[in-house]
A protein has these predicted regions:
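Charged/polar low-complexity intrinsically disordered segments
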Residues: 3, 12, 26-28
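Non-catalytic interaction-recognition regions
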Residues: 22, 33-127, 145-638
């Protein structure tokens, strides 16, 4: 029995030794895929346990980047730990710093400034971190699984009475980029579009085409279908304005004041009355009206498809208002029967939202026709029937803030439990130097013209540079497309989405400063360096030795690369694609300074040379991943 007890004791001692040895190895030597901050966080938790005998959570470890005026990479703020240590801030910081220095290989040194523990990370840790990043082709990206939350994102939402314009371009690019960062945070994403293919605005184009079109088609005119229909929307407005002006003058001649005369003229305009009559016929399923509507919409869809392809956006599911508005009308009628809404004397149906601090909201007109709110209720209901959505995000301009506030309340009132969880990704308007865009006046920046102009401007810049003269014509045009579209996308995405912005094409195509072409040029430069290294027979190992001597600037770049994962998380959490855009710019700006100050291919120390090649390779990788989330392509050559 005594021998068995001795053996058991020895076995327990051995197991304890193994566990302790493994723990120390894990803290000291093991290469971890975690960022250094996460490793330090785990080590601080262990230090507090060892020093003060208490467990703390990761949230209690307050790490931040060290301010530039102090020595260090990361700073631990210890004030939140004083109740545990029961010591002065300086003493607590000193003890934790010394424990980390003695028990881990993370630190080269540390210093204490009051309650701030400034940590200088050991150079070996930076190279270990770079090796981990280098081994991960999708660093910073969390791929969704079958069980991941499902997020639906609606963007684009065009009307079929006009082509897409600059405002639509910002919407589409924001929607695509938002989908990218949300998916990169481990969510399944369904990209969706609601096409406003019915309503009075559609009838205006249809009526104008009947009156003034003479059977014109996209084929006979040589125009894209969306542009052709847009011309007739403008034509309707032109004739309507002339009609109103004539009627207003008539009513004023009869003694009516200017304001009342204009209101009466707009109401009694024969052209507008015909458009409303056509809308009523459409909702009554009139065969002739429906046939014309289908024909003209098909022209528009073909045009839209070309524009979407040029912008590099697509959708997983497209809804059409003509399919959803009846579902919305039915939901409103059911709400009316339950006393949730009320009918006015003229027959229109309204929602009283005064108890919610809002006003009354029209849901059905007196003639029974629906409004945008009716359609959105129906579309939301269909979407949640079609998909097990965990979250619904609408990418719509900030002029619709009130609309989505009301939609959320109405859906909740109708008993749809997901109503209050809707997210309105509200963004600012794109303005021109001469003011806002108005499609009814034909004074818009057309999306197709904008895309063509950006590509042409990029091509001109490339030709003037007279570089890569060995490129074929096809290659030059492809680079021009990538650069032109990159300039457009980056310029629109780098700005906080909530802000209004002024679009300047010339500024966006600049190869210097905070622009897409500047980032693309840096990427192409790195790819060129890597190709030259291969041609020169320079071999780079899969794993860098950790004892290579590196500079402070190189440490900073590794830290900047490692920040990518946190930036992606922030962008997904806060719905801010601009965070990724500006991160990419700051990274390439820092790399360009490094490129200016340090030799790479001409470096005589082979160990430093291979380190800098791996560093450059991973700058390019992270930039490609980040810009890819935004829908921006990277050229291999420029």
């Amino acid at each position: 029995i005594r021998q068995i007890a001795v053996h058991r004791f020895r076995l327990k001692s051995f197991l304890c030794f193994v566990l302790i040895t493994n723990f120390v190895a894990k803290i000291k030597n093991k290469r971890l895929s975690m960022k250094i901050e996460q490793q330090l966080q785990a080590a601080v938790i262990e230090a507090v346990k060892a020093l003060y005998g208490q467990d703390i959570t990761p949230e209690q470890v307050a790490l931040q980047k060290t301010k530039k005026e102090f020595e260090g990479h990361l700073t631990l703020v210890v004030f939140g730990l004083l109740r545990i240590s029961r010591k002065k801030p300086e003493d607590t910081a000193q003890e934790i710093g010394q424990w980390l220095k003695d028990n881990t290989s993370l630190l080269q040194s540390f210093n204490v400034v009051k309650g701030f523990l400034n940590l200088v990370i050991a150079p070996t840790q930076w190279i270990t971190l770079l090796n981990d990043i280098d081994a991960d082709d999708h660093f910073g990206i969390t791929k969704p699984t079958e069980d991941s939350p499902l997020v639906m994102i609606e963007y684009s939402s065009p009307n079929t009475n006009k082509p897409l314009h600059l405002g639509h371009v910002r919407n589409n690019l924001l929607g695509w980029a938002l989908a990218g960062v949300v998916e990169a945070n481990g969510n399944r994403v369904v990209k969706t579009n609601i096409v406003n293919d019915r309503g009075i605005h559609i009838c205006k184009s249809m009526l104008a085409w009947l009156k003034y079109g003479n059977g014109e088609t996209p084929q006979s005119s040589g125009k894209k279908g969306d542009h052709l229909i847009g011309d007739y929307y403008v034509a309707f407005d032109k004739h309507y304005r002339a009609e109103v002006k004539e009627l207003q003058a008539k009513f004023m001649a009869e003694g009516m004041n200017e304001e009342d005369a204009k209101a009466k003229a707009e109401k009694e305009s024969p052209l507008m009355q015909e458009a409303h009559a056509m809308l009523v016929k459409w909702e009554a399923n009139d065969p002739e009206v429906r046939a014309l509507w289908r024909k003209m919409n098909e022209w528009v869809y073909e045009g839209f498809d070309e524009t979407y392809k040029a912008l590099g956006v697509s959708f997983d599911k497209i809804y059409y208002e003509s399919d959803t508005y009846l579902v919305g009308k039915q939901a409103v009628e059911e709400g009316l029967s339950k006393g949730l809404f009320f009918r006015k004397e003229d027959g229109s149906v309204w929602a009283d939202l005064t108890k919610d601090g809002l006003d009354e909201k029209l849901l059905l007109r007196a003639d029974g026709t629906s409004v945008y709110m009716t359609q959105d209720i129906g579309t939301a209901k269909l979407r949640f029937q079609d998909f097990p959505i965990n979250k619904m995000i609408y990418v719509v301009g900030n002029e619709q803030n009130y609309h989505f506030q009301v939609l959320s309340i109405l859906l909740d009132r109708l008993g749809f439990e997901w109503g209050k969880s809707l997210v309105h990704f509200s963004y600012g308007m794109v303005e021109l130097p001469n003011g806002k865009m108005k499609s009814r006046e034909g004074t818009v920046v057309d999306a197709d013209d904008l895309v063509a102009g950006m590509i042409a401007q990029a091509r001109q810049t490339i030709d003037e540079a007279k570089k890569n003269t060995d490129m074929s014509e096809e290659e030059k045009q492809e680079v021009a497309r990538i650069v032109g579209m990159g300039a457009l996308k980056y310029f629109l995405l780098k700005v906080d989405a909530r802000k209004n912005m002024l679009f300047n094409p010339e500024e966006s195509i600049d190869f210097n400063g905070n622009t897409g072409p500047f980032i693309q040029y840096t990427y192409a430069r790195i790819r060129s360096i890597l190709r030259k290294a291969v041609d020169a027979g320079i071999n780079v190992p899969d794993t860098l030795p950790t004892d290579i001597e590196i500079s402070t600037k190189e440490e900073e770049i590794i830290q900047h690369i490692a920040d990518f994962a946190a930036v992606v998380r922030q962008a997904g959490k806060e719905y801010q694609p601009a965070a990724v855009a500006n991160y990419c710019y700051e990274l390439v700006k820092e790399y360009n300074q490094f490129y200016h100050d340090f030799s790479i291919l001409r470096e005589e120390d082979s160990r430093k040379q291979m380190f800098r090649l791996v560093l450059s390779k991973n700058v390019a990788k992270v930039v490609r991943l980040g810009m890819g989330l935004l829908g921006i392509e990277m050229p291999e050559r420029m």
